[in-house]
């Protein structure tokens, strides 16, 4: 900075004001590219320059210590500082710098318009001859500055929280939960996720309007991101919202610097909350740009998707029954001439269909508002006949949900569409879906489980853990998959763009014994789902389905004959039969499966068969057999006419779960020498395993968890030379392990929670690099063996009661 002394203008008789002003003008002209400086400020100073020359010439008559001349001197000094500082001004500081230039301009104008006249009056002098010259100069300067002055900061309303214009129902609980998390100092980033139409934006807008939140955060900014996020535009909006001029950023790095500078400036006045609404999948790097480490700065995101990198993820659930009812009543007033009972009955049927989805309740409610009782009845009847909410007359719901499907990767789209093949409100074991996908898409189970997780993270289904989340060995029975009915409809709607016979996926619903006419034509679907009610008599039409690779049969009757046309499905790879009735259904015509050369996976749930039925089919391609909640009756051993090792030559996995009347395994299972995984879980009556189990030399995984009556493992278990994982958790009656279990040199992992009464033979010390998962009490059995066992790892886990298990039944 130049001071007055260094310029030699501090003495009486010298040009005190004009000389410095001339230096500042010459310096400012060098920066031609920056108009506020080289043009606007220079123009102002050039008009002021003759006035300063006149003032300098009258030093003897004027008192340079008076207030007006001190302020003029300060203004010229500030101009000098501002001009010399310009080369060091960063691009993101130019808006702030421009406002500083504007203030200097205004102060110079003030001197000419007011201060100079006060000075003249005080000294009773006629400056500039006072023959109109001063007045003309000042007027000209005023007009010039009106044209050239930098506009005052404009605070544009670009990032304000939207005003709520909808009724708010059912958000009190989630509002309290979110508020608690947001006020938690340890939470810096928070995501509110849910399917579209569940009220995420409404909830967050209401949260931002909460007195406690407004009291905590001095600055609350709300930005809609959507599926095409533009980081630079959002930063520009934030700057303009706070009174800065619009800046054009050449890249995101510049915008990041601009955002940081803005936040650092704002946080001096108080904490900041930045809301990013409707952020889409794949925006992780976009979100990272906002995650600047500053105290008193938090980010709140709403999304259809989860973002695991954030501190906290809150999943907004559908409305509870009472709240859903209140919302429907708000939108749809009671039709005239309706009795209370009739009105309540219609309400309940509509609510069941809407299933707590706020947007669906609103759209349906608005469509029924002011309509007659017959219209209400007609709508309910049309749903019972198969009409979908996502079609006419409710296109709004589909428009809301469709982008979620469109955003999926191609692989996930196919998997999501397959979900429409299962019944609504069904709780599906993850293993059912993965088994089907393994054969349809030829991918490994770990990849396919990842697909399920991806769909769950996008709130297109829900993945509910039942147990300890152990699926490293390809065991996915401990997860349930559920899906909201509206999302299931979304999957089905995508297939309905084609005619029935041309669809890749096809759902056939048979009420009583009525078949649609199109069943008589050739069906080209590769995934076929057939559902029958409890009145179905198993009188099948002959259907031609040559391309079916996966068949899902949903039944409700107590007796069920498999359709003979299955024998013509030569491409069939996966068969899933699920009984939704209360008792196991007697299954007949099982023999129609024997002619299927490509059938690789069979899953039977809640049906009654004899265990001898399986080897008699002689399915040489079968890889996996799953029997869940099945009834077997008496176990038969007569397989003399069947060479089991040939009849089931490729069978690698048997999964028997919750089969309550299974007290012993059929002998033929011990003859399946190809078997690699044998899971017998939650079979409380199972008391023993056959001695011949030692024949299963290729067996790698043996699961016996929750077989509470099992008292011991046969000594022949030592013959399972390839066994690497043994699960005996919750086998409460198990008293000992085989004496020579130490011979199983490939055994690397034992899971034995709640087995503290089980005796460990001395030979276990021969097992090297063993990992044991158990509870604390069982862990004591192993701790004392650590000195004798090389690399023994004991992982004690707390036993938690998982209420999700109740969802299975």
From Swiss-Prot:
Domain RPW8: 1-150
Domain NB-ARC stretches: 153-280, 339-438
Residues annotated as binding ATP: 194-201
Residue spans of the LRR repeats: 650-672, 674-696, 698-720, 722-744
PROSITE patterns xrefs: RPW8
Coiled coil stretches, renumbered: 50-86, 494-515
GO molecular function: ADP binding; ATP binding
Keywords: ATP-binding, Coiled coil, Leucine-rich repeat, Nucleotide-binding, Plant defense, Repeat
Pfam families assigned to the protein according to its UniProt record, in alphabetical order: LRR_1, NB-ARC, RPW8
Role of this protein: Probable disease resistance protein.
The family this protein is said to belong to: Belongs to the disease resistance NB-LRR family.
Record text about domains: The LRR repeats probably act as specificity determinant of pathogen recognition.
Name of the protein this chain belongs to: Probable disease resistance protein At5g66900
Species of the source: Arabidopsis thaliana
Lineage, uppermost ranks: Eukaryota, Viridiplantae, Streptophyta, Embryophyta, Tracheophyta
